[in-house]
């Protein structure tokens, strides 16, 4: 058992018989009273995401997650297929369970599969990924003065705010923790 104050983004825990993954966590201190933990959590089996508030002293059951190196292969209907790099065994996972990660997946990308017992419950992405810009506005002269950036759609469908010099066809490096532009590839 661990206290909710010890939970971090990406951790899996069990509460009320459900396996839950922390997607986002925020410590909130109201004007009066005790600190609260505001969290976005995902049921790893159904894929549903819920915003919840817990007391930092609440206890939850931490779940042991086993990790295996894998490669993303392809999508088939509503499932994504991954291959274990050691055994070459293929695993399928419902796309609703990896809705956030799906925005960054490209064919043959290496990831880590997360298992609880023998059940695939999610994937972990590398810290950064290289994606291709498929649609963005052309560069406007003098746009670098304000430094605001412009939206760009990647080959995976992800929309990233990029500097004004980025154009269609460019490959860029994107941070997977927050979806922010990092640099040109």
Curated annotation (Swiss-Prot):
User: What does the record give as the function of this protein?
Assistant: Involved in peptide bond synthesis. Stimulates efficient translation and peptide-bond synthesis on native or reconstituted 70S ribosomes in vitro. Probably functions indirectly by altering the affinity of the ribosome for aminoacyl-tRNA, thus increasing their reactivity as acceptors for peptidyl transferase.
- The organism named in the record is Limosilactobacillus fermentum (strain NBRC 3956 / LMG 18251) (Lactobacillus fermentum)
Q: Which gene encodes it?
A: efp
Query: What NCBIfam families does the record tag this protein with?
Result: efp (TIGR00038), PRK00529.1 (NF001810)
Example GO biological process: peptide biosynthetic process
The pathway is:
Protein biosynthesis; polypeptide chain elongation
Q: What is this protein called?
A: Elongation factor P
**Where in or outside the cell is it found?**
Cytoplasm
Tell me if Ribosomal protein is a UniProt keyword of this record: no
**InterPro entries in UniProt:** Elong-fact-P_C, NA-bd_OB-fold, Rib_uL2_dom2, Transl_elong_fac_P/YeiP, Transl_elong_KOW-like, Transl_elong_P/YeiP_cen, Transl_elong_P/YeiP_CS, Transl_elongation_fac_P
Q: Which SMART domains match?
A: EFP (SM01185), Elong-fact-P_C (SM00841)
